[in-house]
Amino acid sequence: MENLPSLLESIYTTWLSLSSTIWAMDMILAFVCGLGLYLLLLPFLESHLSSSPSDINFTRKPQIQMTWQSQYMKKFRNHCRNDAKAWEECLKKLKEKEKDELFLEEMSPGHHLNSLGNMFNSASAKQDSTTLSPFWNLKEKSEEQMATQKLSYPKISGDHLQEKYDQLYWGLPSLHSESLVAAAWIPQTTSTLPSPFFLFNVISSVYPIHLQDKMSPVLPHTHPLSYLDLQPPPLILSPLEFQSPALNQVHFQSPLPVLLPSSLPYSRDSGACYSQSQSKPHCPTTEIQYRERPLVTKQLESRLTLPLMVQKDAYSILASNPSHDWAVPIFPDNFPISCELRDKLEQHIQKWFIQHQWYFPPEIQESEEVMGLQNSVTGNYQIRDQPCTSQAHMSTGEHNKQGQKVKFQLENESCKNLGPILGKGPKDPVKGLEKNVVKVQGANILEPERNLVKHFKSDSRNDSSNYIDEDLENNWKANFGTKSGQINQGLTPLSMRQSWLAMNDSFCDTDIHMETRNLTAIKSSEKFMCSREKLAFLNPETRQTLEEHVVRFWVKHRWGLPLKMLKPINLFKLKSTESLPLTLCTQPSSTNSVHRTNSAVEVVRFLGKPCLRQIIIKDSSPPPGNLLLVSSPSCKRAAIRRPPSGVDHEPSVALPNKPQSAYLAETLAYNFMETPTQSGGVLKDEMETEEVLLLPRMTCAPNLRAHNPQAKVVSEYPYNVETELTGQPQIYTTSVLLPKHSRSMPLPVDTLTSNALGDIVMVDGGNGLVQQRPSTPKHQVSQKGQIKMLVPTYQGEDTKRQSERKYEDMSKFSPVTERKNNFENQYYQTLPKTTQVLPESLFQRLLSRFLPRVHPKKTIKGQECHPQKDNPTAATAQNQRRQVRKQPYMDDNVTEAQKLMTTVGQMLEKKMMQHQHHASKVNQPRVVPPGPTSWFSHGHMPVSCLKRRRPPSYPANSLCQRRYIQGRHNRGQLPQKSVQFSQKPQILRNPRHMYPKSALNVVNSSQNRTTVPRTPNQHLCCPRHCAFQRNVCRELGHPSVAFPNRKT
């Protein structure tokens, strides 16, 4: 060692010299360094080269394969050439980490997926290879090691455990093809025996530690069960506390995601499934050990014959982290229940999942102790048309001290479910289910079962143990053979396939056709009991909220849908809302209730989508001659035709038959072709939006005083529109009276087109059809409740002015007749029967409002008002209906201007009367009394003023009197304006809105009214009032001028 520095120094100087041997020395030195490095790293290289590429593919994370040696290799290459001290440091670090590296190599998944022989040898290298004692005698050592373990890679596993836990809990099939990230366990103390390494969906070849001392005597060709039951003492799987060999066999047959949801408070931490049972394991008898050892050896030897997919999915190691650092709550944080109820529910769910994770035949469940508990135990069942999980529940009993008998019993509280857990289940357990044969296309799974049965029989002959029942063995063999065959073919077990079939029947077509048959019929009656008896600690509101919460999770993951949701979804796929038929008048009119079909209503209620094309019309008190007409592009129904005259007052209503429906359909088609542009556009919009229009009814009344029923649209749901009739009288405003038609005649073109404009058609018993124009009701329905929409009435300005002005002398009638005539004149208006007037369009209404403002003195075409001659015989009590012409539309400003001019005329008339009484005082100034402008409007005068009116008692100006008489003579030929005086004083409207160019009216007083003929070009030639009259006309040109009381 002392010569080493000098040797290195000489080598260094030689290397730097320019001798001829420098290249040879370099080659020798490089070879020596490479050889030493190879020998140093040879153990590490062997461990990595031993794992095959196919086995390495099972690991999901490449960082597991990347070890820390590669990092040190890079550092070594960079620093060893520059500094010798770096070389020594690297060697020291490699020696310190050598032990840990060996441990990581043994823990790596690729190393354990080598082969069965390597896995077995590496696991039992320090123990006797001639016996299997490590499988049974390492209980104490494993407990000590598990107590000192800690998780060294929380980031590697913690990021994925929470994500995978939801899949484990809800039974998602993704875990069947995916694996969780491995979590390494490193002991705190330097122990030669490493701690077990836990993986999900991969095979771990840790040496056999604390394998369940209870091994199954008969193992399938696929599973060495000794490597599957690594678990800590506080978390012991209850089915493995040595039950019968059948229990252990079936427990490890199908590593399913459906099995893993049975998670307990500890299973939330690591995503694994555990039983709640924390009882200590019991040591098996020597007979069981003797029987199991040769079987385990044979199964281990035949392991390599299985496909890789089975090796990957079958060897799921169930492990957990006792800590609650990664706890995933079953319920949301804001779930409205208390902490105590939350704990109870979590325990309840965990028990249910554990009890429902395996599908054993009912014979395995039954025992002498369970027969008395059949009423309280719920078993699963399976119906061919109703896919349901046929799950058997079992829990393990306790061994007696001698270990001579195995007891099987069921949990007292089983089949509690949320969604399906909180749903319903059969009351009695299933009996007589001996064997389930599953046939898959292109797969024959009977051979593994036959071989297994033969193998089981050959071992059972050599063993003279009597603690296992023969019937139980036979039942187990049939069930286990089926599942082992499925696993050998690389298929998922029956439990997951049933869930897939339930989903595929609703959403997609399955590629694998299966047929499940029960060789024995179900003897027990299918009685259901709700979970209310089991979950008595929850109130109904909390239970309903909990069910909705679970159902939303299952629907979100599209897996494990409750059965109550599959049926409506299937119906929705078959019958969409677009193909639902239109129901119109399908029930007789005498029925007041509506019968709905279950399928359509359930689909609509479940999905919450409105069915706008289904309409049901209901009549509570149908009057005679009702017309129920629905015009829809999808279905054009027949209207109820009007009965003959002899049955006008019958209360019954006939439904439309086929000929009437066809006739009305043709009429509707014809009317749609002849519809005007504006109405046709509205109908076209209705066709595009597929909105159903509900036209009013045609009612026949004996006289005009009969009230008209009011249409009321009641909607309870969007797909149910009901129309009722009320007996309250409704006021309708009449604008046009159509000529008479036959009672059996359908609606004309104008009637159909006026529907879009809001017209309502009524039938008068004697005068024909009355067309009204109320505002169009909007049949908009709400899903939250019943909204009653009344057909509103519309009273236009024309009718208001008609009600204010009377053209007849009301003093000639009695008070009763006067009220009748007022009512009729207010609500009814007729035209000559020989003419037919089309409804006034919106454009015409706007035009009629605009033209009077532009040309107030000109008469609008179509609105001429012919003078009505005074005919005292026309206003008798026998005539109960009067023919009134349509009042020409005039603006409010023009009306106020005319009223103002009437008031001015009254003032002039009063002045003339005063001039007659005081003719002798012509030269004296006169005081004009206050005008009635501020107290009276519409040309009304108090009665006292009318009584003081007298005919002129003195000779007036001849020219003025002659022109006054001439205007009175031509009163019947000129347009006139009649104003009736009222006893109540009225306030004059704002004079600012008066029209400035109104013509001056000459006033003629009568007994109860004043007639003002419109003479634009004529003026009274009164010498005193002509100037005043011109001043008034001049002031009218200024709308802001007020009219105070004047003195002359």
Curated annotation (Swiss-Prot):
GO biological process assignments: cell differentiation; spermatogenesis
Gene Ontology MF terms in the entry: actin binding
Chain positions covered by the region annotation Disordered: 858-887
Chief place where the protein resides: membrane
Gene Ontology CC: acrosomal lumen; acrosomal membrane; acrosomal vesicle
Subcellular location(s) of the protein: Cytoplasmic vesicle, Secretory vesicle, Acrosome membrane; Cytoplasmic vesicle, Secretory vesicle, Acrosome lumen
Tissue specificity remark: Specifically expressed in testis by haploid germ cells.
Pfam families named among the record's database cross-references: FAM75
TM regions (residue ranges): 22-42
Membrane topology label: Single-pass membrane protein
Compositionally skewed regions (Polar residues) per UniProt: 870-881
Keywords: Cytoplasmic vesicle, Differentiation, Membrane, Spermatogenesis, Transmembrane, Transmembrane helix
Family in the record: Belongs to the SPATA31 family.
Subunit and interaction comment: May interact with ACTB and the syntaxin STX1A and/or STX1B.
Described purpose of this protein according to its UniProt entry: May play a role in spermatogenesis.
Protein name, as recorded: Spermatogenesis-associated protein 31
Lineage, uppermost ranks: Eukaryota, Metazoa, Chordata, Craniata, Vertebrata
Recorded name of the encoding gene: Spata31
